[in-house]
A protein has these predicted regions:
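Conserved ABC ATPase "signature" region
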Residues: 73, 126-145, 348, 397-415, ...
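ABC ATPase "signature
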Residues: 232-236, 244, 505-506
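ABC ATPase NBD coupling module
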Residues: 62, 75-92, 110, 118, ...
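A short, proline-enriched helix->beta-strand linker immediately N-terminal to the Walker B motif
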Residues: 169-173, 439-443, 459
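Conserved ABC transporter NBD signature motif
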Residues: 63-74, 340-348, 402
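Conserved ABC ATPase signature
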Residues: 149-154, 158, 420-424, 428
Length: 542
């Protein structure tokens, strides 16, 4: 007997949307203890279908037909009070963007404790103890410090782990995981996948796992659903769908998966450094709240040095909290380093101010990790893409034309110009962020997890686009990523960071296939779907 049954579900979009339905004719069952993966491009209806199960659809989006049956009840017919009782306790969800889902004004421990309080479970001291245990289970380093921290004080991967801890707090019957490992490094991702597998086995918990990572699908899925523009186009056992796909769309998605065996070409042209980093250091002081709080010193970046050459792409990889993103922010002067030099064109940007720094920032643009927090929620896409151009002297009409061109380059329709960031899926918002970074035609791009929120087909398009721009404009890129397959596809060299320091650097093929350090080997061993990749290459089973 099915634990959850969805039949003939139609979810209507508001008038004026690019299509009539977010999801159309959706039908599937979920059994106790089963892991069902839903894959598809951004905007395919994956998240909308999951939100309908939770009763969390946007106000303007309505289920207009069908039924969602759980424990003998049609969820679509329940009152809000009944849904509040159901959410968290029986069905729980891990959201895609933790920074927007977590309360920025509450400490992590209070947010986890709030889950128990809302359902009348545990005494206050027990809630604190259970919160610590949950943070340990999801791999948060130093849970005692993390429980007192605010979300902004944690890395992107650590914030996602907090969200997972909250979702698992009440040990639900069904866990809906919407891209839960997108922001996680490979070792933490492996820990979370193992944790979800353990809970499935020990408690019979069922999981709906929404992802664009086919390696993850191969490692955990019992069954797979493939969605395209709101409809299910293929469903079946994981090995059947992944190795013997029937639908052309599924075959196209699988063909776009980056492989460790696909290496970037060696950079051509001169070897002139366009960016030189020498002895970069950055320390943060966290904690110390209240009269007796003890501050904690974190050396986020320790003596980092490297050169980035014209036309070269360097990948920076490592676990969450290794200092990857902090390096990127120091280079752009979004935060100031404590020591070291950052040389662009022979000039140290640490000594620049005013017009000189402004001019250098035009040459060096950043693509951020979390598009929801880096895009102005009150600005239409047209303003987001044109304000930088206009600030540097481009006429409004020319800037608007450039914005339309940029949207096409990143795979979005020009009609997106008139919409706000909240009207897009997570992957679509990331594409807008990439378009904004490309607007001023910089010579250096710092991409902080720039494709982590994208499905494989759009990811492949964006990587191809960046490679094309690199060749055409002699563009140099610093590519911060936790996805070693993406690094294999686009990077000429790889820097491996651990606890703020560089532990290995070398050509991509050397680092990925003959690493010098045990730490790099541990990252490689944790990559999901390696057996699947070998099976694809050999044409066999996994």
């Amino acid at each position: 007997m099915s634990l959850l049954s969805i039949r003939d579900l139609d979810i209507a979009l508001p008038e004026g949307a690019d299509r009539a339905y977010a999801a159309k004719d959706i039908s599937f069952d979920l059994a106790a203890g089963e892991i069902l993966c839903i894959v598809g491009e951004s905007g395919s209806g994956k998240s909308m279908s999951a939100n309908a199960v939770m009763g969390l659809l946007p106000q303007e989006v309505k289920p207009v037909r069908g039924a969602i049956t759980f424990d003998g009840q049609n969820i679509l017919a329940l009152s809000e009070a009944q849904m509040l009782e159901l959410r968290g306790r029986r069905i729980s969800m891990i959201f895609q963007e933790p920074l927007s889902a977590l309360n920025p004004l509450m400490r992590v421990g209070a947010q986890i404790a709030e889950v128990f309080e809302a359902h009348g479970q545990l005494r206050p001291q027990q809630r604190h103890s259970r919160a610590l245990t949950l943070l340990e289970e999801v791999g948060i380093p130093d849970p005692e410090s993390a429980i007192r921290a605010y979300p902004f004080q944690l890395s992107g991967g650590q914030r996602q782990r907090v969200m997972i801890a909250m979702a698992l707090a009440l040990e639900p019957d069904i866990l809906i995981a919407d891209e839960p490992t997108t922001a996680l490094d490979v070792t933490t991702q492996a820990q979370i996948l193992d944790l979800i597998e353990d809970l499935r086995r020990s408690r019979g918990m069922a999981v709906i796992f929404i992802t664009h990572d086919f390696g993850v699908v191969a490692d955990i899925a019992d069954r797979v659903i493939v969605m395209q523009t709101g409809e299910i186009v293929e469903t079946g056992a994981a090995d059947e769908v992944l190795l013997r796909p029937r639908h052309p769309y599924t075959r196209a998605l699988i063909a776009a998966i980056p492989r460790l065996t696909l290496q970037a070409d060696a950079p051509a042209g001169d070897r002139v450094p366009v960016l030189s980093v020498e002895g970069l250091n950055k320390t943060f002081v966290t904690g110390g709240g209240g009269l007796f709080g003890k501050p904690r010193v974190v050396r986020a970046v320790r003596d980092v040095s490297f050169d980035l050459h014209a036309g070269e792409t360097i990948g920076i990889v490592g676990e969450s909290g290794s200092g990857k993103s902090t390096v990127g922010r120091c280079l752009t002067r979004l935060i100031d380093p404590d020591g070291g030099r950052v040389m662009i064109g022979g000039a140290d940007i640490a000594l620049m101010s005013g017009a000189e720094l402004r001019d250098k920032r035009r040459q060096l643009q950043m693509i951020f990790q979390d598009p929801f927090s880096s895009l102005n929620p009150r600005a239409r896409v047209s303003r987001i893409l044109t304000e930088g151009l206009i600030a540097y002297g481009t006429g409004r009409a020319q800037a608007m034309e450039r914005a339309r061109e940029l949207l096409g380059l990143v795979g979005l329709d020009p009609s997106a110009m008139h919409r706000f960031p909240h009207e897009f899926s997570g992957g679509q918002r990331q594409r807008i962020g990439i378009a904004r970074a490309l607007a001023l035609e910089p010579s250096i791009i710092i991409a902080d997890e720039a494709v982590s929120a994208l499905d494989v087909s759009i990811q492949a398009q964006v990587l191809d686009l960046l490679a094309e721009l690199k060749a055409r404009l002699n563009l140099s890129m610093l590519f911060i990523t936790h996805d070693l397959r993406v690094a294999a596809r686009i990077c000429d060299r790889i820097i491996v960071m651990q606890k703020g320091a560089i532990v290995e650097v070398g050509p991509t093929g050397k680092v990925l296939h003959d690493p010098d350090t045990a730490y790099t080997r541990s990252l490689l061993d944790a990559i999901p779907g390696q057996e699947y990749e070998r099976a694809l290459a050999a044409g066999g089973d996994f």
